[in-house]
């Protein structure tokens, strides 16, 4: 049976692991402001805004959410891990939220305790937020940097997380198929993206049934091009293009799919019409670099080794000057997360790490060429979770 979220048991194990780390570090509580970290530990997903919110995990005591009143009724609908909810009306308010947070922590018996935190300001600081640091409101408490605690826990995925990523990859292949099918001469890439997103999302919901909902995205599937059409495909982080799709274009499609808040990444370079000799050469070198990366994935290899493998292919082809980014990055709850497949990162690959593999080359005024696959590092080497065709014939749109 397919699960659509992390089990309550796994959330409880994560909390227990946090408390063991707190005890070892002689800390009395963990105070978190990062919404992704809160979701990772509790399964509670909310829209993070200028309004401060925090999760407090005491060594002994109730796991408590501090936040705006508009979240009070939302918390119990999403999780049973959070045991207490304490709220203020709104930001900035007649009394600033951080003053409320200081009072809440005093009531929890933490006013003079040692707490690990990801923000000594006491808030994530989004959307123009301003406020006195929590450390100045609770001068007798000691706040210690624990910003890497949750990211380090997230690095190696559990069996439940891997299962969610596998399911995400399955639906990404469907969405990429629709993106490719809907490309037409004179079409606006946004219209194609919306059509593919809508159809893939509808099929996904109908197939998975009433219990499925996306947990960290507005739509189950997000499929599109971000304006990476023709010459704009040479801009890796393009956001839009003023023109429509036409014959001869190189097109880069991207897909993510939310399963339990986790998402794979699938990207494919497509060519609309018969490829030119130059397009064919650039495309094939990019695929060769990708294959070199796949061969390099193995336990004990460094993240930098993957990047070096693709750089070597591009250098041999005379394309080193067309590289604009490293080979990949971690995947899971966020579109980009550690580890980085970068020449400057000598961190060792470990079984259970999931990353994107996306070497690319980009010539300004001509085109960009990049596929991205989601790769699970295993004891045997690596497993491709996304499996959409990568060859030029399959990705040529006639």
Identify what each model region corresponds to.
Residues 1-398:
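Active-site neighborhoods and metal-handling regions in enzymes and metal-associated proteins
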């Amino acid at each position: 049976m397919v699960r659509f979220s992390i089990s309550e048991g796994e959330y409880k194990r994560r909390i227990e692991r946090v408390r063991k780390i707190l005890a070892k570090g002689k800390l009395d509580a963990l105070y978190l402001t990062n919404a992704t970290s809160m979701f990772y530990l509790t399964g509670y997903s909310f829209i993070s805004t200028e309004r401060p919110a925090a999760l407090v995990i005491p060594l002994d005591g109730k796991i408590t959410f501090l936040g705006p009143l508009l979240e009070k009724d939302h918390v119990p609908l999403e999780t049973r891990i959070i045991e207490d909810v304490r709220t203020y009306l709104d930001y900035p308010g007649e009394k600033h939220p951080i003053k409320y947070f200081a009072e809440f922590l005093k009531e929890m018996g933490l006013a003079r305790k040692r707490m690990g935190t990801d923000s000594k300001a006491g808030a994530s600081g989004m959307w123009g937020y301003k406020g006195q640091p929590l450390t100045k409101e609770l001068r007798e408490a000691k706040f210690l940097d624990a910003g890497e605690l949750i990211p380090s826990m997230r690095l190696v995925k559990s069996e439940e997380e891997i299962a969610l990523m596998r399911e995400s990859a399955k639906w990404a292949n469907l969405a990429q198929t629709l993106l490719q099918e809907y490309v037409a001469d004179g079409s606006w890439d946004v219209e194609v993206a919306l059509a593919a997103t809508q159809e893939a999302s509808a099929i996904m919901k109908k197939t998975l049934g009433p219990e499925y909902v996306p947990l960290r995205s507005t739509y189950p599937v997000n499929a599109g091009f971000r304006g990476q059409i023709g010459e704009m495909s040479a801009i890796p982080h393009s956001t839009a293009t003023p023109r429509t799709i036409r014959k001869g274009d190189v097109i880069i499609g991207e897909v993510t799919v939310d399963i339990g808040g986790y998402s794979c990444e699938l990207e494919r370079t497509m060519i609309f019409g018969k490829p030119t000799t130059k397009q064919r050469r650039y495309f094939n070198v990019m695929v060769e670099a990708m294959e070199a990366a796949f061969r390099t994935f193995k336990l004990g290899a460094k993240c930098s080794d993957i990047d070096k493998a693709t750089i070597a292919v591009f250098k041999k082809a005379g394309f080193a000057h067309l590289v604009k980014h490293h080979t990949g990055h971690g995947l899971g709850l966020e579109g980009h997360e550690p580890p980085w497949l970068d020449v400057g990162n000598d961190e060792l690959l470990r079984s259970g790490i999931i990353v994107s593999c996306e070497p690319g080359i980009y010539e300004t005024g001509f085109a960009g060429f990049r596929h991205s696959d989601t790769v699970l590092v295993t004891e045997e080497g690596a497993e491709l979770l996304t499996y959409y065709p990568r060859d030029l014939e399959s990705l040529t749109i006639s």
